[in-house]
A protein has these predicted regions:
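Catalytic-loop region of hydrolases
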Residues: 17-66, 74
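N-terminal cap/lid subdomain of alpha/beta-hydrolase-fold enzymes
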Residues: 51-114
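Conserved acidic catalytic loop of the alpha/beta-hydrolase fold
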Residues: 115, 126-147
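Conserved hydrolase catalytic core segment
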Residues: 143-186
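Alpha/beta-hydrolase-fold enzymes
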Residues: 168-170, 174-257
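Short beta-strand/loop motif that positions the catalytic acidic residue
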Residues: 296, 302-304
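Conserved alpha/beta-hydrolase "acid-adjacent" motif
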Residues: 309-315
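Catalytic active-site module of serine/aspartate enzymes centered on a nucleophile-bearing elbow/loop
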Residues: 318, 325-361
């Protein structure tokens, strides 16, 4: 069961994670001086943690960007990496970035006053994209990508890259994520924030010890949306649990160990980032998500999970109609949102096969 929990947090397939063929990432810290956020607040220093796999070639044209998802680190795409997978590090240079608010990149928990804890500014998906654009262009001297691949909040970033920088990448892949957080998704996130902040220990974010009751309530509420209803009915959690594991034990594991060590303000910060995502609010589109999607120029592989409760396939189907060069390929899985991160062998194969084929075109 703990392997499954870790898999869902990091999106590191336990099958890929144990493979000797993975070229494990080298970790770096990129510092942006006086980083101005969309809200107008300026951080004297903003840190972006990232990892790299493989080597940048002399032409500097073999780079692939892998932006992280909710509370994940730079290891979140190892299910795609290695011999026999879609991303071969003997040929490609992979850059895996970490979102603001994950506890490693600049976050409420690791930033000094006056921006510590609940005073840390809300960071939008565009803030994250702009920071990574500076990393690529100014620090790594990469002005063009071979591909960009994102899962969940990484998919949100993929959509924003496609709109903000329509010529920056040859191809883009989005799995289990949409171009906008629609009202139902916003309500879900607010429910999870409410569960977390109801703990009196939370104290409006100025807590002196972790709000354990709130964190446990958050874990249970989040878990209810993670998989499909049929996944639970068929008890597919047994495929990754020790023999004899009970349903009560599964729930308790999610309640007490969902994101070990996570800071409550960090969790909330990234939920606010998620809530505000909308490519239609990019400058020049006046809030029109359809117009923003129509502006996407490059081939776009759109892979929603057929049973995702976070990003329903109906939302993805609606959006796909406005992307000129879309390949719409739903993942036929019962694993809900997690299907987009290869949470089981069948989904891992489906993703790798389709992404590898897309990148070869």
């Amino acid at each position: 069961m703990k392997n499954l929990i870790l898999l869902l947090l990091l999106s590191q397939s336990i099958y890929a994670q144990n493979s000797p063929n993975i070229d494990h990432a080298k970790r770096f810290d990129f510092v942006l001086q006086n980083f101005k956020t969309e809200s107008g607040i300026v951080l004297p220093q903003a840190h972006i943690i990232y990892g790299t796999y493989g080597h940048l070639n002399a032409e500097r044209n073999n780079a692939v960007l892998l932006p992280s998802h909710y509370m994940a680190d730079h290891r979140g795409y190892e299910w795609l990496i290695g011999v026999g997978h879609a991303l071969d590090t003997t040929k490609l240079f992979l850059i895996a970035t970490e979102l603001f608010g994950n506890g490693n990149s600049s976050s409420p928990s690791n930033t000094a006053e006056p921006f510590h804890g609940p005073r840390f500014p809300v960071m939008t998906i565009r803030d994250n994209v702009e920071a990574v654009h500076k990393l690529l262009v100014e620090d790594l001297k990469i002005t063009h990508l071979k591909a960009l691949i994102g899962f969940s909040m990484g998919a949100q970033q993929a959509f924003q890259w496609a709109v903000s920088y329509p010529d920056f990448s040859d191809r883009i892949v989005a799995t289990s994520g949409t171009a906008k957080t629609y009202p139902h998704g916003f309500v879900r996130l607010e429910g999870q924030i409410a569960a977390l902040t109801a703990d009196e220990v939370f104290n409006n974010g100025d807590y002196s010890k972790p709000p354990v009751k709130g964190l446990q309530a958050f874990g249970i509420v989040w878990t209810a949306w993670l998989y499909s209803q049929e996944w639970w009915r068929k008890e597919l959690w047994r495929t990754t649990s020790a023999p004899g594991t009970t349903f009560a034990q599964v729930l308790n594991e999610y309640k007490t160990n969902f994101i070990p060590g996570a800071d409550a303000n960090n969790l909330i910060l990234q939920m606010h980032t998620w809530e505000q995502h909308d490519v239609g609010t990019t400058a020049g589109f006046n809030g029109n998500v359809e117009a923003a999607l129509k502006s996407i120029k490059v081939p776009f592989l759109y892979m929603p999970s057929a049973t995702d409760l976070y990003f329903p396939i109906g939302d993805a189907t609606y959006e796909s109609a406005f992307i000129k060069k879309v390949i719409f390929k739903p993942i036929p899985s019962l694993w809900g949102h997690t299907a987009g991160a290869a949470s089981n062998p069948a989904d891992e194969k489906f993703l790798n096969d389709n992404i590898a084929n897309f990148l070869k075109k």
